[in-house]
Amino acid sequence: MKLIKTQDAVGHVLCHDITQIIKGVTKDALFRKGHIVTEEDIPLLLSVGKEHLYVWENDESMMHENDAAMVLLDMCKNERMSYGEIKEGKIELKSEIHGLLKVDRKALFTVNSFGQMMIATRHGNTVVNPGDKLAGMRIIPLVIKKEKMDKVRSLITSPILEIKPFVLKKAAVITTGSEVYKGRIQDTFTPVIQDKLAEFGCEMVYHAICDDDDKMVTEKINEALTQGVDIVLCTGGMSVDPDDRTPLAIKNTGANIISYGSPVLPGAMFLLSYKGEVPIVGLPGCVMYAKRTVFDLVLCRLLAKDVVTYEELCDLGEGGSVSYTHLTLPTILRV
């Protein structure tokens, strides 16, 4: 690669795309990499501010931006992803399915801190749909040392990105509360849960309404588990009131309690546990009336069979003091 004056470029091969930007009209390549410059091209090149050009001069120790973009792509791509053509040295990955995007943040940092290259992704642990852009990547200079690209490639041992499909399809909902059990009010909680599950193709296949009786709730949870449900959601009875017995009922199933309480508002009284591989979740009343709560941050992960840890829940405190009523899925979960 060498630098020459544009007026002297006739007959030379361009090393990179030449971009034209017209506000509100276009931002695209005026000439593509590999184009042989003609006399007629000179005025156009000057009109986009190109008084000098990089033209091709073979150097086996260097890698062109397009080839380097493919190396970066190879570090990111995984199953259920597709990519298009390279434009102006950049290439993008897209999702082929409705699923949960996972990002290896440490590996991503490794690449972006290596110098002269970048990968920009969506936030991890977010819901993606077919056709959604997942990431874009390129090197910063026009060419880069092959040795440098080989080195960074050797540091990334598994794909930076992954899309997990939503595989949990059968849910049990245990509705608690004496006011519902005794027919004093209508159950308005369960329909909310059904709608949220439907966003991920999950169906409520078991439903029970229980009094404020921990033994009854425990019995119904265990009954649901024997019917092979993938996830159990217990609504209500999660606060410190004397009649709220759901946390004790979940504990008495023998489930492993990950956390009772979350650093997110709405959703402080949220409970997450697992019995074997089956999540058993305690949902506070805010889930019924607030459009988005901590439940929405976690549900997409649970239905993708992505295990949520105590540390990950604790990490939600940063940004957790937010009104989720104005958010729509996909919702950001940083951990």
PLM segments and residue spans:
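Short, low-complexity N-terminal leaders and the immediately following helix N-cap/first helix
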Residues: 1-88
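Internal, active-site/partner-interface "lid" segment
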Residues: 306-324
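Glycine-rich phosphate/nucleotide-binding loop
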Residues: 241-310
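Residue-level recognition of short, solvent-exposed, well-ordered loop/turn junctions
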Residues: 32, 38, 123, 127-130, ...
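N-terminal small/polar loop signature for handling phosphorylated ligands or for N-terminal nucleophile
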Residues: 195-235, 239-253
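Glycine-rich phosphate/diphosphate-binding loop of Rossmann-like nucleotide-binding domains
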Residues: 160-212
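Extended, charged alpha/beta regions that create polyanion-binding interfaces
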Residues: 59-166
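Conserved small/polar residues in nucleotide/adenosyl-binding loops
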Residues: 325-331
